[in-house]
A protein has these predicted regions:
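Nucleotide/pyrophosphate-binding catalytic subdomain
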Residues: 1-206
Length: 206
């Protein structure tokens, strides 16, 4: 039987909003609470309403963000976690939606099996990544599919490392390569692909 590994990215714009939230926490701006509610929580709630889901399964993640905001203290370890939370939200929402229709699926965080060699964390690409194949295969042994948040892994100090922009595609490709997948598909929410770079060429078309 075929098994499916589903790697998701964040909802459009939410990673940028999480980065903005970090800046607001650093500067202790007064609107950091309303920004979190409007740009993060409400975006997830709108999606959940469309899917008829209760978002109680995100409460642990939400409490982490509330705790950070209330403390007004951030270290780089917290920041890398926050920046990558958009993918976590999407993966958990999708997994819950699949469970609703009785699919044998499980949310599985990439930090459980994607390792990076970087020690000095940044909010950008954190070095080389590798997949611990046996761990994900073990998870798939009793599931038809797993839903994984892209964009991140973990280093030997158990700190979250980021893959940089397009990190979810990178996550999918290295997993597909390591598992020697029969097929690797990238699904995206664009209406098409330009025939050339519209910023450099004239008369390009979709």
């Amino acid at each position: 039987d075929f098994k499916n590994v589903i790697v998701v990215s964040a909802i459009k714009g939410i990673t940028n909003d999480l980065i903005t939230l970090i800046y607001k926490i650093r500067k202790d701006e007064k609107d950091k609470y309303t920004f979190l509610e409007k740009n993060i929580f409400n975006v997830n709630s709108d999606l959940a309403k469309q899917l008829d889901l209760d978002l109680s399964f995100l409460e642990e993640d939400y409490n982490f963000l509330r705790l950070i905001i209330n403390s007004s203290y951030l270290n780089l370890k917290d920041e890398t976690k926050i920046v990558s939370m958009g993918e976590t939200f999407t993966a958990k929402i999708l997994n819950q939606y699949l469970l609703k229709y009785d699919h044998l699926t499980e949310f599985f965080d990439a930090v459980n099996f994607i390792k990076c060699n970087q020690k000095n964390l940044t909010l950008h690409n954190n070095g080389n990544f590798s997949v611990e194949k046996d761990i994900i295969l073990g998870k798939l042994a009793n599931k038809d599919m797993v839903v994984i948040p892209g964009f991140r892994g973990i280093n030997s100090d158990e700190e979250i490392c980021l893959m940089g922009r397009g990190g979810s595609d990178t996550t999918g490709s290295i997993i597909a390569s390591e598992l020697q997948s029969i097929k690797y598909q990238i699904w995206t929410d664009v209406s098409g692909i330009y025939s050339g770079d519209p910023n450099k060429m004239k008369n390009v078309h979709i």
